[in-house]
Regions:
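Acidic beta-strand-to-loop metal/phosphate-binding motif
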Residues: 82, 145-153, 452-454
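Short active-site loop/helix that positions an aromatic residue
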Residues: 90-91, 100, 154-166, 179-183, ...
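Structural signature of nuclease core domains in nucleic-acid processing machines
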Residues: 94-146, 157-161, 166-171, 735-737, ...
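Conserved beta-strand -> loop -> alpha-helix junction used to position metal-binding or nucleic-acid-contacting
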Residues: 166-185, 192-193, 481-485
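Conserved pre-motif C helix in the palm subdomain of viral-like polymerases
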Residues: 233-240, 689-712
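C-terminal structured "cap/appendage" subdomains that terminate the fold
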Residues: 711-769
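Cell-envelope/ECM-targeting effectors and their regulatory/trafficking segments
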Residues: 784-883
């Protein structure tokens, strides 16, 4: 571009910052180095492509406040409009808005540029509006009753709120992407351009996405008059896709009725769309995290991971040295110490080529679901190493990088993160933080003056299974407040209920009138078997997986484990025929309709249920036996397989009992008859297991979502200052003022139970309160010490707990018998009392000239309340400056 567009002062300013600007551009551009000439050529090619593609566009570029004011006035008058943002990237915290697009019916789409930059110099283009100017006009929309249409509203609402300081939640009327996830959740190409081309243009267009035009990070350097062509079009086609979708989601519309989408309509308008505002609030609120705790966890887990990797490599070396394992396939690693458990070629070679392990599915999968079924210690060790690797790389190392300027992590919440309708989150995925890794979860804490409150449904999915299956025995067990798994074990195995409890009543009572119970190992085993079967049905697990879960540590062969698991599985289903009926009905529904439905009518499409077990296709060289070379009329069918042949082969293959027989016959047909056989049995088996799981898991997700809506709209909860900040499957995490924790706990539990009022038995929620997620419960049950002399065990626990809650890594001592403490104790919480520990505290006070009274005062007034900053306490290592 010509420098004549700038004044001398502007040119001088640009020259002064040129080097800095070039460095900035290099950082924002792809890693491959670009010369100025090369960059300009790339930008020109980009612009030419956009101009050519949108040559018929009528989009307008808004470059003045007056022009924007008039456009917004027309949009408000129309009552409807669509909005889209263009940004520097997808990071909602660190990326920024470059421009905003608007459209209203009967008008012309527009683009409002704000942060487009001149290449090389990073100087802003002329005639752009500031964030404040755009925000002022968008606030007029926020103050009106305009109904806005979005494509991925969650992202646009977040960016507008962060950069433009405008809250458009109440104007958010419709999201074309979210609606389509409800209508057809299994369609993978569900981006705006693909949906618009497929359904509005009937597949006749040429859909090009953002990445087809703009190389990474270069959109801000696109000229505004070029950018408008692409950006404004997004707003326009969003609205047009909305008008196409609308008849299918309006209950009174013939298209909705014809496709039996009335329940989906209720789900969209009554649950998913109202929940968009709740997700926005959770994203904005965020959750505090102490990144420096990651240092401690890194020191803890790295040595463990290294030790487990060395153990694995030692096992690999033993296998390599074992003469019974041989293969002609070249080894993909040089030495055992080079073996990488994350490498698919390494693991596949070891398991399949060398050890000849059989997945039972004919493939070479190295995923968790397959390796977990192998009765081989090395496979279990591979999974253990992978689990530790994920723990360190995904959580310990990455979580601190996700912290925003306010010290919080602001997740992106996906309302339909799974095809079942379950929530998920990203940046980071909080649902993937393992519950067993309590110390990872303890990185998250409440803000000062607040506590975290966790409330989860007690046996949510078993209760929904009882409700959906209408099993009278299960329903009655819940009505009688009996342990459901012990009841199932009792009926299935013909054993008294008390003998299926983990802790069996003795018939005696203590001084307070409580029943005295004794540990019952056989009862625990029976209950565990019943629980594994019921959850296996719910989660769609195969008998092979169930066998591994139940009998992994038994010295039996794989065949014996599977046989035993099948026996237990059949015993439970025979005792509870309604469960078997649920499985059969769900599978039949999927076969007939191609989908199953939840209690609210959400559909989970499972097309593989409608596949034939075997498909037959002619290969090169196939000759139709019905062809008469002298009859010209038969020649058109010479490459087709006659139906009678298909029927005969289908009957033959379905008669085989074992996989090996089927595989052998398929090879013979290919080699001798030139008929390719597609075996769909595995796909159908996998699909069959999804049927019940989709109903139960999807219904559980809906129950949790209904609870979130009740909580968000509850005046009493809001008056108490509580707010939900995180959903994790059947659990909701809330942050509440410390002074209202009891009232909030009662209210949260009631509202969640109210969301399950459709059940024929009482619902129950387990509520815990703590400073940290997965921390010790608040209020602390330990006494406050009055002296540091001769501390009791409870008092040491109390001191350790509160110091840990305020971010101190405490010394850990072995128990009197020499054992190192585990769990919380290993972190200095629930610490062990020893003379060494007592003397440590006294020596600490003497060394730093702190009286015992001062120490106690600090514990009482600073640490206990959590409302004041923690001052440095000598050689206690402070791992966070936040309390």
């Amino acid at each position: 571009m010509s420098l004549g567009l700038f004044s001398r002062a502007q040119i001088a300013q640009v020259n002064a910052i040129a080097e800095k600007s070039k460095a900035s551009l290099e950082q924002s551009a792809p890693k491959t180095a670009r010369s100025t000439k090369g960059l300009n050529a790339e930008l020109k090619a980009m612009s030419d492509a956009v101009i050519e593609y949108f040559k018929d566009s009528k989009a307008i570029l808004i470059t003045s406040k007056e022009q924007l004011h008039d456009y917004v006035t027309n949009l408000i008058d129309s009552g409807y409009g669509s909005l889209d943002t263009e940004t520097t990237g997808l990071d909602r915290i660190r990326d920024t808005i470059v421009g905003v697009s608007l459209y209203y019916p009967g008008g012309v789409e527009c683009y409002i540029p704000s942060k487009h930059l001149v290449p090389i110099f990073d100087a802003p283009y002329k005639d752009q509006l500031t964030y404040e100017e755009i925000g002022e006009e968008l606030q007029r929309i926020a103050d009106s009753s305009v109904k806005l249409i979005f494509a991925n509203a969650d992202f646009d609402l977040s960016m507008i709120y962060k950069d433009l300081k405008v809250d458009l939640i109440k104007n958010c009327y419709y999201d074309v992407i979210l609606a389509w996830r409800c209508l057809k959740e299994n369609e993978r190409n569900n981006r705006l351009k693909e949906l618009y081309n497929k359904y509005v243009l009937k597949g006749k267009g040429d859909p090009k996405t953002f990445s087809d035009f703009f190389p990474p990070k270069l959109f801000p350097y696109c000229k505004p008059e070029v950018a408008k062509l692409y950006a404004a079009n997004d707003a326009k086609i969003t609205y047009e896709l909305f008008t196409w979708q609308l008849p299918y989601v309006m209950k009174d519309n013939p298209k909705c009725k014809k496709n039996h989408l009335e329940a989906i309509s209720d789900l969209i308008w009554g649950v998913e769309f109202p929940l968009m505002g709740v997700c926005q609030k959770m994203h904005r609120d965020g959750i505090y995290i102490e990144p420096s705790m990651a240092e401690m966890l890194n020191r803890k887990y790295l040595p463990i991971a290294d030790a487990e990797l060395k153990k694995l490599q030692g096992m690999v070396q033993e296998i390599l040295d074992n003469p019974k394992y041989t293969t002609r396939v070249k080894r993909p690693f040089l030495r055992a110490t080079d073996f990488n458990p994350e490498s698919t070629p390494h693991v596949a070679w070891l398991c399949y080529d060398l050890m000849k392990l059989d997945s039972g599915k004919g493939g070479r999968s190295t995923g968790k679901e397959i390796l977990g079924t192998f009765n081989a210690p090395v496979a279990k060790q591979i999974l253990k190493c992978r689990s530790l690797g994920v723990l360190i790389s995904t959580f310990v190392k990455k979580l601190p990088n996700a912290v925003g300027p306010d010290g919080k992590i602001h997740c992106t919440f996906k309302q339909i993160g799974a095809d079942t309708g379950r929530f998920s989150s990203a940046d980071p995925n909080m649902q993937n933080i393992p519950s067993k890794a309590g110390d990872i979860r303890r990185m998250f804490r409440a803000m000062p003056g607040h506590v975290l409150m966790s409330s989860d449904y007690s046996q949510q999915e078993p209760k929904l299974t009882a409700y959906v299956s209408q099993d009278e025995k299960m329903v009655q067990a819940f009505k009688d407040n009996k342990d459901i798994y012990s009841i199932i074990a009792s009926i299935a195995f013909g054993v008294p209920y008390e003998d299926c409890l983990e802790f069996k009543p003795t018939g005696k009572f203590d001084e307070d009138g409580n029943p005295i119970k004794v540990y019952n190992a056989s009862g625990k085993a029976r209950r565990g078997e019943a629980k594994t079967i019921v959850l296996g049905i719910t989660y769609g697990r195969s008998v092979v997986t169930i066998a591994d879960q139940l009998y992994a540590h038994e010295p039996w062969s794989d065949e014996e484990k599977i046989k035993k698991a099948q026996h237990v599985f059949d015993s439970v289903l025979n005792a509870f025929p309604s469960l078997r009926k649920l499985m059969i009905n769900a599978q039949n529904c999927a076969k007939t309709n191609g989908y199953v439905e939840t209690i609210l009518g959400r559909r989970r499409h499972i097309p593989d249920m409608q596949l034939p077990e075997f498909e037959f296709k002619p290969m090169k060289g196939y000759v139709n036996p019905d062809i008469d070379p002298l009859d010209v009329s038969t020649l058109d069918n010479q490459e087709s397989i006659p139906q009678r042949v298909v029927d005969r082969l289908y009957k033959e293959l379905t008669s085989y009992k074992y996989f090996g027989q089927v595989a052998k016959r398929i090879r013979e047909l290919a080699e001798n008859d030139h008929i390719k056989v597609i075996n769909n049995r595995f796909k159908i088996q996998e699909a069959s297991r999804k049927c019940v799981n989709s109903i139960i898991q999807g219904s559980a997700a809906e129950q949790t979502k209904l609870a979130m809506l009740l909580i968000d709209n509850d005046p009493e909860w809001n008056a108490l200052g509580g707010h939900v900040i995180l959903p994790v499957h059947d659990e909701l995490i809330a942050e509440v003022p410390i002074e209202n924790w009891e009232a909030c706990a009662n209210r949260l539990s009631k509202l969640m139970c109210d969301a399950a009022s459709f059940l024929p038995f009482a619902s129950k929620c387990d509520v815990t309160v703590s400073y940290r997620w997965n921390g010790m419960e608040y209020p602390c049950k330990y006494p406050e010490p009055n002296s540091l002399d001769n501390l009791t065990e409870d008092e040491v626990m109390w001191v350790q707990y509160h110091l840990f809650e305020c971010g101190y890594e405490l010394p850990v001592f072995k128990t009197p018998d020499g054992d190192k403490p585990e769990g919380d104790a290993a972190l200095g919480v629930n610490g062990v009392v020893t003379d060494q520990y007592n003397s440590y505290i006294r020596d600490y006070c003497n060394r730093y000239n702190i009286t015992e009274d001062e120490f106690i005062y600090h514990i009482h007034t600073k640490v206990h309340t959590g409302s004041a900053p923690v001052k440095q306490l000598g050689d206690y290592k402070q791992i966070s400056s936040k309390s």
